[in-house]
């Protein structure tokens, strides 16, 4: 049995962690790989951090492509081979499915929120949906649990005012945009969030403070509303609508 009380103590995502612990105990009893629903980045970060030191249980995560934000967790006994970092484009045994949502959105453009709303409106729960990739005028692609593909093909027929057709595609057919890498060197007097983020995103510090105070800024997937919050090497900073950056290293000047 897992030390549930200790693992749950002080957890921010207590309900999510409790469900994952249930799955972990199931994996220990059955000697099978057990998969969670899709989790958000902060949920994944907390679960992995709290389960990291368990010698009897191993945890992996996969969302359909390397940069996926929403992912499913795989749990298995430490004696069971578990590697979700399969290099094949469509690894077998990983319960993820990709769908194409095709329509003509030239005169009624749809956003990520529109496609998510249409999926939820069709009757699918949020935790059954992974990342959604908007393709402009032609529609979108989404990653979902495999058991919902046929249901969505029948029940998702419209996004905004646009009729759509849903079909299954291979994970290797996802239109993944490779992450854009740009090196930025900046000399800052401190590692305050507002100072580092304003330099990284190329906007004024006062504007960055406003973004932070509005809750638009996340550090390592957690919303931060204090401009004076201290960041460090390897931290991710994301701003809604602007993208994300990672602090590669911090060098002291003399």
Regions found by a protein language model. Name each.
Residues 1-200, 223, 236, 243-254:
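Ferredoxin-like alpha/beta domains used as RNA- or RNAP-binding modules
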Residues 204-254:
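Accessory, usually C-terminal, subdomains that scaffold auxiliary metal cofactors
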